[in-house]
Amino acid sequence: MPRPTKTRTVVSEPDVCYFKPRGVPLRMLREVGLTVDELEALMLADLQGLPHEEAGRHMNISRATFGRVVRKARKTVADALVNGMAIRIEGGNYLRTGPDGAVLFCGKCRQEWPVVSSGGTPHECPMCKKEEDKKAEK
């Protein structure tokens, strides 16, 4: 049985969560999925040019894990570009850090709730009751 995926830290939600080739109706397109944490990895590595070790620290994961995440993200984007597919950005196991500290985020229904430093933070989504894997820390 594989180990559970470690919660990754991202700075913000993407403003745009869908891309498709111009001039092709959506109903005629195949679609690939890119998770929010994979998008964050692309931003850190390719847009900001951070070394994998530093980018991994930003996301609260190891350098090796960051390398696997960014490699999968690049493969997904390349597949979509080369084969003319749409890209949907959603989901993933991540913790979004906000201006006032950490918040938990449900990948299923997109609900957010704050992390309480006293340890009283609920570990399930208040909306859909999806159980969270890890306790987030500030």
UniProtKB/Swiss-Prot annotation:
Q: Which domain of life is it from?
A: Bacteria
What protein family does this chain belong to?
A: Belongs to the UPF0251 family.
HAMAP family xref list: UPF0251
Name of protein: UPF0251 protein Dole_1957
Q: Which organism is it from?
A: Desulfosudis oleivorans (strain DSM 6200 / JCM 39069 / Hxd3)
Q: What is the lineage of its organism?
A: Bacteria, Pseudomonadati, Thermodesulfobacteriota, Desulfobacteria, Desulfobacterales
